[in-house]
UniProtKB/Swiss-Prot annotation:
UniProt xrefs under CDD domains: DMB-PRT_CobT
Catalytic activity: 5,6-dimethylbenzimidazole + nicotinate beta-D-ribonucleotide = alpha-ribazole 5'-phosphate + nicotinate + H(+)
Record keywords, A-Z: Cobalamin biosynthesis, Glycosyltransferase, Transferase
Domain of life: Bacteria
UniProt protein name: Nicotinate-nucleotide--dimethylbenzimidazole phosphoribosyltransferase
Protein species of origin: Chlorobium phaeovibrioides (strain DSM 265 / 1930) (Prosthecochloris vibrioformis (strain DSM 265))
Amino acid sequence: MKEKFLALIAAVSPADHSLSGAAQAHLDDLTKPQGSLGRLEEIALRFVQATASLSPVINRKKICCFAGDHGVAREGVSAFPSEVTPQMVYTMLSGGAAINVFARHVGADLAVVDMGVNHDFPDHPVLVKRKVAKGTGNIAAGPAMSENEAIGAILAGAALAAEAHDEGYHLLGTGEMGIANTTPAAALYSVLLGVPVDGITGRGTGIDDERLQHKKEVIKRAVGVNAGLCTTPLGTLAALGGYEIAGIAGFILGAAACRVPVVVDGFISSAGAVVAMKLCPVVADYLFFSHLSNEQGHRAVMQALGARPILDLDLRLGEGTGAALAMQMIEASVKMYNEMATFSSASVSEKDGE
């Protein structure tokens, strides 16, 4: 299993920056003042680089929502009980969750991936069963999982990305569902990015001031208890993470290995992205951070990564909702790149002096 994990990381190559000159020249030749479409031009350029194609396409889009339960929920860090995780999975399977609505709106297919929910689901066409275990260990008392379990979750996520590539998807998105998962996400950020727990920890599902302070203490305890295990990115993931977070990290690695761009959702999905980037820094070339989450600390994470999210809508739901909405912006960017007329081909006068 470790060999497959190392092979996955080795399979990721940087984006093709040799195409930058030609792609930028094409963008500048489009019938508009140069740079007037702002970040849409930047997005199109990055998409060309990631896909290594001067004629990029987005014919199919898919969002994978990874679900898992967390032992640390027993510490009372969430406003909701763990039973809500399988309940929300069922809502997604029935088509009634926010991510279902948004995925339908943007024309993206949706898969709900059971990475570690403490429940046995019946078969369903939208459900992908990749359960590693029925929930993680309580990180406030010890590690979330073993390194082998973390690798297993990573490889499962990577395989889903490879399958999506083989099925003809050109743009992938991440989502998640798991009560209490802002707690392991904050713990991972604290260790992997060196940000203070107090500044990275937010209210998650809407906890009050007293429970927020308790949550911060739980995270600090988790980081302290597991300090000896957090010597590598993989060890840190195993000690403090979640099965859905590990699945997202693998999904990103697998997509990057296939040169498929990934739209990262919010606070928890970004933790999976940080894990992937720490394991293999060049995956950053393939990531589009969808939105700035309203969850406290996400801004600090984006600043630490030097990332600029596409949207800022005060979202804090997760599920892949922000990723779905940002897919529209990316798709518009690629259509702009491909479908606009150029000064070279159209009877449009260029700027005086050119």
